[in-house]
Amino acid sequence: MIRTPKHLTKQESVNLGAYYTPPYLVDCAYKLLKKHVGIENYTLLDTACGNKEFLKLHHPKKIGADIDPKCDALTINALANPKRENYGISQDEPLIIVGNPPYNDRTSFIKQDIKNKDFIFEIDNDLKSRDLGISFLKSFAILKPAFICVLHPLSYLIKEANFKQLKLFKDHYRLLDALVVSSKSFTKSNEFPIVIALYERGRMDYADIRRFIFPTDCDTTLCLNDFDYIANYVDKYPNAKKVGACVGYFFPMRDINALKRNKTFLNAPSANVVRISQDKLIYYQYIHYFKEIAPKIPYYFGNLDIIIDHFAFLEIKDAFLKDKRARLEYFKKLFQGHPCEFD
């Protein structure tokens, strides 16, 4: 069951990113945290605590706050002038931040019909981002906890453009441990990967994330460096200035989840299309067939670019384009070791 605060409308829940965390995910988060930290000597703080799922454990000192005055907690906007004294925490107090901070990408197409881009509450300029969750991560860095153990979309880390937005955070914290879980506990459709992430003081760069081995709730692991990606071979976005002789048109691409929703080849040109040159046509045909199998691969690939084994594809490209069985065998090998639903 998807749980949201009963006193909020559906639109308010989406705009505030307000979805309660199932107890089993809270348990997973604390299991991850306790594997590395003796938490008894730390104050626990959840700055967007909702119904305080992360604060129901027995603990010497735990503090909950939320922007929603109807929550039974301190009424504090965590994104306006964040500082420890707002929460009654001293500067030298050992601190761990926990929780499931709101996330709501205003630029995403998901639930765009009910998102209100004019929905405003105060956010400090250095914390502003297109996604509330990224703003929260940056606010945590200002409070200087020893550890941070929170849920957030995996895309914050694995999409390089998102990762760059985390500068204030990534310059002061590094990923220590993680578990990738499905968003299906929070949304009925458009399943995407969420990470229960444990951070410690330090710093990280995108190369660290590419090397990181993410355990998943499917008893598998995900490592970005294990794969090659179609973006290394074709344009994903409108490219009129780069392509002279054009043999076709393609819908702009984001990630695998977007490919599931969107068209591939287009009949007519426009300002917002990818133009295809003859030498790149086979790769766009590859993407077209990848779309067919995309719903059959595990959810945790959803925010990655389209995956390709370039050498293996070129070896069988003619058979791949003509023979469904050849394509199926190729994709089985590409995703070997992952729980797919191929025929």
Give residue spans per PLM region.
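Short amphipathic alpha-helix with an adjacent loop that forms part of the alpha/beta core around
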Residues: T75-L95
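Conserved Class I SAM-dependent methyltransferase catalytic core
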Residues: D126-S183, A197-L198
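Amphipathic alpha-helical repeat scaffolds
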Residues: N77, I97-N104
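Flexible, glycine-/basic-rich loop-and-beta segments that form/coincide
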Residues: N190-C246
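Class I S-adenosyl-L-methionine
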Residues: M1-A80, K317, K324-D343
